[in-house]
Regions:
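A structural signal for short, well-ordered beta-strand segments
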Residues: 5-7, 54, 79
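Short, solvent-exposed amphipathic alpha-helical segments in soluble enzyme
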Residues: 22, 70-71
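Short, electropositive alpha-helical surface patch
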Residues: 55-68
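A common structural junction motif
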Residues: 71-78
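A short, structured active-site edge motif that brings together acidic residues
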Residues: 78-85
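Short S/T/G/P-rich N-terminal loop/turn motif that feeds into the first structured element of a domain
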Residues: 1-50, 59-62, 85
Length: 85
């Protein structure tokens, strides 16, 4: 299944200038994605809007939810199943 995941945060929690938090976010998600059989197809960022978008392939919604678990403290997440056209 394909999923469109949107992550948002605000200026106060932005990781752009906090290298330790940025590494925790990126490494935490990458490791959890691999552990839960979630493949990162694409990643897009809009720095001005404090938004990151992922296209993921996963067996089910639960796998995506588990992959996001280590980074939930960094903001809000919207998980939406999608299909290719």
């Amino acid at each position: 299944m394909l999923f469109h995941v949107t992550h948002t945060h605000d200026y106060q929690t932005c990781m752009a200038h906090r290298e330790e938090a940025r590494n925790e976010f990126n490494d935490g998600f990458t490791k959890a994605a691999t552990a839960n059989n979630v493949q990162i197809i694409a990643t897009y960022n809009n720095r001005g809007r404090h938004t990151r978008i992922w296209i993921l392939e996963a067996p089910d919604y639960h796998a995506v939810d588990k992959a996001l678990e280590p980074i939930l403290k960094f903001g809000n997440y919207d998980i939406m199943p999608v299909s290719a056209m």
